Swiss-Prot record:
It comes from Yersinia pseudotuberculosis serotype I (strain IP32953). The chain crosses the membrane at residues 3-23. Residues 32-126 form the 2Fe-2S ferredoxin-type domain. This is Na(+)-translocating NADH-quinone reductase subunit F. Belongs to the NqrF family. The keyword Lipid metabolism does not apply. It is a single-pass membrane protein. NQR complex catalyzes the reduction of ubiquinone-1 to ubiquinol by two successive reactions, coupled with the transport of Na(+) ions from the cytoplasm to the periplasm. The first step is catalyzed by NqrF, which accepts electrons from NADH and reduces ubiquinone-1 to ubisemiquinone by a one-electron transfer pathway. GO terms for cellular component: plasma membrane. The keyword Oxidoreductase does not apply.
């Protein structure tokens, strides 16, 4: 009898606790619909079920906030201003948001779990961002580890971007085998040397990443991207390869791809100052976009130079395009430095790292480098070396423009 009584009492206690938890949850967590008020504008505001991330809620209502990392909290792009609701700022946001910005309501939309009504502010340009389903025109190697992806915009549509802007590209869950990649013979040596065809990329959920555009606004009807394959570093050979770059490298003509945009902050200043562009690797993309825009669309008379770093001649691309621009424009010069020229290159040009070449062959004798505008995009080590060199020359932050995505 005592055992039965004990079981009954235990069951009653568990039931009572369950009821208490459910009651507390009903009071503390909004499981119904909430309202997101945007810019105090009823036409932009919406109602949705509580519990999702703000970034996802906005996207599902056709409002696409930039998020290069796909909502992982690592890029810090999806900034919104929350005027009411949203709870306390999370530790994951503090590396991207200063104390002053936090006091002003700045949050990362991908980290805000919406449990109550919100009042938020968004920049007006966000409402011009749209989605398109594009068709792959071509996807060809331009260098050993870089492909040029050319996408066709749907007939009659226009992506109203500015030079230096970027789009976001979406990938559904997939499995990609590197052995299936179409890598031309001239580039296969390094792929075989590093045994790269053994890799596979597996995505179990949708992925979104940002890529800078290589085309300029008057190249109508297309989107042009330079995509470097993100293989595991030699020091961590068992790490997974990059999901999005692997997906893009697997694309073939005729495939469909969803993009959203345009986004961007890496825009040219409207001044008469000299422009110095510095790039490396897939950082070529925004360099091409800017330089083509300045010389082909704007017919700029500003003094412009482009300094590009590559390993060897095989890693150079768009060479004929820039040679032609140089021949047609007296105000434009471009220079390449090879860090590891091969014997077959028969290279007689600059050698070494591009920041040293730029300094030794131009900036050290420049009468006023601090008056120039510097636009750069490349591998992180290149970016850091260039910025240090420019700071040592007295160039202010306002004249150093960096695109973090193209490299």
């Amino acid at each position: 009898m005592e055992i039965i009584l004990g079981v009954v009492m235990f069951t009653l206690i568990v039931l009572a606790l369950t009821v208490m938890i459910l009651f507390a949850k009903s009071k503390l967590v909004n499981t119904g619909d909430i309202t997101v008020e945007i810019n105090e504008d009823e036409d932009k505001s919406f109602t949705a079920p509580a519990g999702d991330k703000l970034l996802n809620m906005l996207s599902s209502h056709g409002i696409f906030v930039s998020s290069a990392c796909g909502g992982g909290g690592s890029c810090g792009q999806c900034r919104v201003t929350i005027k009411e609701g949203g709870g306390d700022i999370l530790p994951t946001e503090l590396s991207h948001i200063s104390k002053r910005e936090a006091k002003e309501g700045c949050r990362l939309a991908c980290q805000v779990n919406v449990k109550q009504n919100l009042k938020i502010e968004l920049p007006e340009e966000i409402f011009g961002v749209k989605k398109w389903t594009c068709e792959v025109i071509s996807n060809d190697n331009k260098a050993t580890f870089i492909k040029e992806l050319k996408l066709k915009i749907p007939d009659g549509d226009v992506v109203p971007f500015r030079a230096g802007g970027f789009i976001q590209i979406e990938a559904e869950p997939h499995t990609v085998k590197y052995a299936d990649f179409d890598v031309p013979t001239e580039y296969r040596g390094d792929w075989d040397k590093f045994n790269l065809f053994r890799f596979e990329s597996v995505a179990t959920e949708p992925t979104v990443r940002a890529y800078s555009m290589a085309n300029y606004p008057e190249e109508h009807g297309i989107i042009l991207l330079n995509v470097r394959i993100a293989t595991p570093p030699p020091s961590v050979p068992d790490a997974p390869p990059g999901i999005m770059s692997s997906y893009i490298w697997s694309l073939k003509p005729g495939d469909k791809v969803v993009i959203s945009g345009p986004f961007g902050e890496f825009f040219a200043k409207d001044t008469d100052a000299e422009m110095v562009f510095i790039g490396g690797g897939a950082g070529m993309a925004p360099m091409r976009s800017h330089i083509f825009d300045q010389l082909k669309r704007l017919h700029s008379k500003r003094k412009i130079s482009f300094w590009y770093g590559a390993r060897s001649r095989r890693e150079m691309f768009y060479e004929e395009d820039f040679d032609q621009l140089q021949a047609e424009n007296d105000n434009f010069r471009w220079h390449v430095a090879l860090s590891d020229p091969q014997p077959e290159d028969n290279w007689t040009g600059y050698t070494g790292f591009i920041h040293n070449v730029l300094l030794e062959n131009y900036l050290k004798d420049h009468p006023a480098p601090e008056d120039c505008e510097f636009y750069m995009c490349g591998p992180p080590m290149m970016n850091a070396a260039v910025i240090k060199m420019l700071k040592d020359l007295g160039v202010e932050d306002e004249n150093i423009m960096l695109d973090d995505f193209g490299g």
